[in-house]
Amino acid sequence: MIFWFCNQPPRMELFQCSWVPYSYSIVSTTSYWPSPDFSQAAFIAANAVVMGSVKIAAGASIWYGAVVRADVESIEIGECTNIQDGAILHGDPGLPTVLEDHVTVGHRAVIHSAHIERGSLIGIGAVILDGVRVGAGSIIGAGSIVTKNIPPLSLVVGVPGKVLRPITPEEAADLIQHAERYKKLALVHAGKGSDIGFYPQE
């Protein structure tokens, strides 16, 4: 087992500053919720928390430390969509969380009772709040907080998030390709492939 420790005051508890590779999947905290069907996913990290009414489409991936908690409302993860490390998906009753195909959810992003349309990218640490719909092919910049609907093909930045400019067709196409590359990388992490997707194959 590998441990990594930060330089912290000596009274800091050990587990607050360590990395531990888990050897099991956390899929439910109680038998009240059935375990989701992982059979179509490209990769589910061993220490991801995925529980409740979660629908996972073919080629989707849920990465290390992510939380997909569908205990009070459903969550749908589309084909080739990736939920990166530390991201959180949750929702309130009556407001399901939906991620369509080829969506990228960056590290530590939070999506709560929102609908993310096809080919969008949610940047690192961004927050998408209840009832928001992000239009297809959009980019939500890192750290943005989105409280209102976003038109398709929009670059959004800031707190609260505002449209900075349109996304070009070339940029939108690259967002789809980025999700495809993440699918290849996910298959390598799952032990099902050798092409990590981000470099040319020799």
What are these language model-derived features?
Residues C6-Q8, Q16:
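Short hydrophobic targeting helices and cationic amphipathic motifs
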Residues L14, W19-P21, V27-W33, D37, ...:
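C-terminal segments of enzyme domains that contribute to small-molecule binding surfaces
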Residues P34-P36, E73-I75, L95, V132:
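A structural detector for short beta-strand units
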Residues Q40, A45-A46, M51-G52, A57-A58, ...:
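Left-handed beta-helix
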Residues V72, G91-P93, I167:
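Short beta->alpha connector loops at strand-helix junctions that form conserved
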